[in-house]
């Protein structure tokens, strides 16, 4: 049943050059119809009160979400709030509007000639527009406006490509435990000298594509904190990993941004397609990609740090995740063949991990990273994220860590920092991070891709940077 639903919903495409314009047209039609049926009969002041109420409600919602709650450091964005305002306008039309005014002829909208005619007119109006029909029409209009807004916002960020992706059915997954073991114990396969590809001959049982599996990668001791509870990890296993004699494959630990989840890299970021294409060109070899959760919730930001408020997120990424990988997966244990990467908040986190613990990962990909870990402003971050402790903040800030690093601290560390060509908000962070990294002895380069702060950039970045990554991790 699930497979049938997935097969059908994969064909329901949500992205295209027409999406935003069609959604705008739908919203305009809904607003116009509701004006015609519910608000044009109102007195002028009451008509003006409808958009005014929508503006006030939207402003209050913005204040609560962006100022008081502030779940996402960079905010939801103008596009999100513009579409939210459109949906609120439709709701206000429904709640504050009415049908033809008492004393008006429903057919003409004009005044009736006599009071007796007025009663008859009201009866005719009730007959023509029964309450249930009006409720159904209003509900349909609100649903259409909401659907249009969600589709338009999705298109703006270049997010879910299909309905299957929204439902989490775009990429089939199986539990890791369901895979057959290639050896009696989860030991690391041996690896010869030189690039892995030079010592590898693809066996006859090599699958045509990799597998996507899920697993729980638990956090360790969280005593003394509010606790960090990561969501389930999603793992890409390349074709070579699925053979009877697994080679010693390198590891890429990958993170999404906020709000986001590990599945986003598969449902939106085309990770499997990218890695399958790389593997097809390299005899089935590709990194084992473990997409982990650095947040615990789409709307919680533990700042990739060990704090009483956020739990031990840093320890999770630097110790718990590597320990779990070497215990449960048959991979190359050499950390010089491991990398960590992420986008936006996850890109910042990748930089934090590398600058705090370069012994854990020697390679990084930071896609559209923030200049500093943030909850929306430096002082707010220090106060809310680190209990007012500036020293704790600086101990988790990549620029501060790199500036204070002794010579040789980052020997052998290298990475790429990438950005969207139209990402004006995050572009200013790149020069500061690059200069700070180079001054600290980190080998770093930058890459730019067409687009803003969205998945069009991040999926393109991964597809482009995987060749550099494969060479860096000793695959080729």
What are these regions (language model features)?
Residues 108-109, 114-115:
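Short linear segments in intrinsically disordered or otherwise low-structure-confidence regions
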């Amino acid at each position: 049943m699930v497979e049938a639903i997935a097969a059908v919903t994969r064909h329901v495409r949500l992205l295209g050059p027409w999406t935003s314009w069609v959604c705008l047209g739908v919203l305009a039609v809904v607003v116009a119809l509701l004006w015609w049926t519910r608000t044009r009969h109102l007195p002028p002041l009451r008509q003006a009160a409808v958009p005014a109420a929508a503006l006030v409600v939207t402003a209050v919602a913005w204040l609560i979400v962006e100022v008081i709650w502030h779940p996402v450091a960079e905010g939801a964005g103008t596009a999100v709030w513009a579409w939210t305002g459109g949906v609120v306008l439709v709701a206000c039309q429904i709640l504050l509007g009415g049908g033809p005014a008492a004393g008006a002829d429903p057919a003409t909208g004009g005044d009736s000639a006599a009071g007796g005619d007025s009663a008859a007119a009201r009866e005719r109006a009730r007959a023509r527009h029964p309450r249930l029909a009006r409720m159904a029409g209003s509900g349909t209009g609100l649903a259409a406006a909401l659907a249009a807004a969600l589709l338009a916002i999705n298109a703006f960020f270049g997010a879910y490509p299909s309905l299957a992706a929204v439902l989490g059915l775009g990429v089939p997954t199986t539990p890791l435990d369901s895979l057959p073991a290639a050896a009696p114990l989860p030991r690391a396969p041996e690896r010869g000298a030189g690039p892995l590809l030079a010592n590898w001959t693809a066996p006859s049982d090599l699958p045509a594509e990799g597998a996507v599996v899920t697993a729980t990668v638990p956090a360790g001791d969280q005593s003394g904190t509010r606790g960090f509870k990561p969501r389930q990890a999603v793992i890409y296993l390349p074709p070579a990993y699925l053979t009877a004699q697994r080679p010693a494959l390198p590891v890429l630990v990958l993170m999404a941004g906020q709000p986001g989840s590990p599945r986003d890299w598969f449902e939106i970021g085309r990770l499997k397609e990218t890695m399958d294409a790389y593997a097809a060109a390299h005899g089935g070899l590709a990194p084992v990609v473990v997409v982990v959760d650095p947040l615990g919730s789409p709307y919680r930001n533990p700042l990739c740090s060990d704090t009483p408020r956020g739990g031990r997120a840093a320890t999770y990424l630097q110790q718990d995740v590597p320990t779990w990988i070497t215990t449960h997966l048959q991979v190359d244990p050499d950390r010089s063949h491991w990398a960590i990467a992420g986008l936006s908040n996850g890109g910042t986190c990748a930089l934090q991990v590398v600058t705090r613990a370069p012994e854990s990962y020697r390679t990084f990909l930071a896609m559209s990273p923030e200049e500093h870990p943030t909850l929306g402003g430096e002082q707010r971050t220090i106060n809310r994220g680190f209990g007012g402790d500036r020293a704790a903040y600086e101990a988790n800030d990549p620029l501060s860590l790199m500036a204070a690093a002794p010579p040789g601290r980052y020997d052998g560390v290298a990475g790429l920092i990438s950005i969207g060509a139209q990402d004006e908000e995050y572009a200013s962070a790149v020069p500061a991070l690059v200069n700070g990294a180079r001054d600290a002895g980190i080998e770093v380069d930058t890459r730019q891709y067409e687009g803003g702060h969205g998945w069009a950039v991040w999926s393109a970045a991964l597809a482009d940077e995987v060749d550099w990554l494969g060479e860096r991790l000793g695959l080729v």
